[in-house]
């Protein structure tokens, strides 16, 4: 047996250290019904609330300018547990990866299946895209109560993202000509979105928050997706101010031969290159 060289020992120790660090930086949560959206998968707002919790715990919130969320597979109740890494550096961003463990058909052992990824962009400034419009004079909104707050007594990202997802999907649906055609299996889904928290809205008397919807990219012939922009405003006893902005990709889907697929305005499946 050959004697171990110092370089080999260092490499082995480094590899073991990386493995231990990765294991310590992983967390898991049981998937329960309160975490699910109307489609039966883990909701966008749950991912964002989890992100906020660990950023706040590590005192990293002040350095966050915006983040991108990409959903890769729906995580469902049958998956039982969702696993995720704590925010860690990757290139110029912080990243959180989420996965579940599933047994593939015909296999005996479970395998790791990525379900979501959040890229957190760091910077000292948070700003909106383009010129800020005049605040809309909406007669509706959410009166902020304790249940809408995070641990810092500010309107939570969970509250904002939950409403943003509903408003973006429904607004894009109403803007789609396809909705006028009979299709009981039509469903609008969100594969990715960006979120920019502009300012924190702390609890105060008579505080309301409300969303403003606009189409950033309208439905086009032969395409399966559109883009919505949702701006969240807060108002108390003075002029409204924007507190968050999100750009949301919305995909039109339908059941085709028993499989949910992106479809164009005629209900036909479109290749990825044409989507």
Please describe what each predicted stretch is.
Residues 2-68, 72-73, 111-192, 244, ...:
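Hot-dog-fold acyl-thioester-processing enzymes
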Residues 68-106, 190-237:
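Hydrophobic beta-sheet segments that form the core/acyl-binding groove
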Residues 105-114, 238-242:
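Residue-level signal for glycine
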Residues 227, 241-244:
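Glycine-rich phosphate/pyrophosphate-binding loop shared by adenosine-nucleotide-utilizing enzymes
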């Amino acid at each position: 047996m050959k004697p171990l060289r110092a370089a080999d020992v260092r490499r082995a120790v480094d590899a073991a250290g990386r493995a231990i660090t990765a294991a310590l930086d992983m967390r898991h949560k049981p998937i329960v019904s309160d975490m699910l959206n109307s489609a039966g998968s883990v909701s966008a707002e749950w991912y964002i609330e989890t992100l906020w919790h660990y950023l706040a715990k590590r005192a990293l919130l002040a350095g966050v300018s915006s983040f991108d969320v990409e959903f890769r597979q729906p995580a469902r109740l049958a998956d039982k547990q969702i696993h995720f890494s704590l925010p860690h550096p990757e290139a110029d961003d912080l990243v959180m990866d989420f996965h579940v463990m599933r047994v593939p058909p015909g296999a005996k052992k479970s395998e790791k299946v990525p379900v979501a990824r959040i890229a957190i962009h760091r910077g000292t400034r948070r700003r909106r895209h383009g010129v800020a419009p005049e605040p809309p004079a909406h007669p509706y909104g959410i009166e902020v109560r304790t249940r809408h707050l995070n641990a810092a007594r500010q309107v939570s990202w969970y509250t904002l993202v939950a409403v943003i997802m509903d408003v973006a999907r429904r607004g894009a649906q109403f803007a789609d000509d396809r909705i006028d055609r009979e299709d009981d299996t039509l469903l609008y889904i969100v594969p990715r979105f960006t979120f920019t928290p502009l300012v924190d809205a702390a609890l105060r008397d008579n505080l309301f928050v409300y969303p403003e919807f606009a189409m950033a990219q309208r439905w086009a012939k032969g395409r399966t997706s559109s883009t919505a922009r949702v701006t969240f405003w807060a108002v108390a006893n003075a002029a409204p101010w924007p507190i968050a902005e999100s750009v949301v990709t919305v995909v039109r889907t339908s059941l085709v031969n028993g499989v949910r697929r992106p479809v164009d305005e005629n209900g036909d499946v479109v290749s990825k290159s044409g989507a």
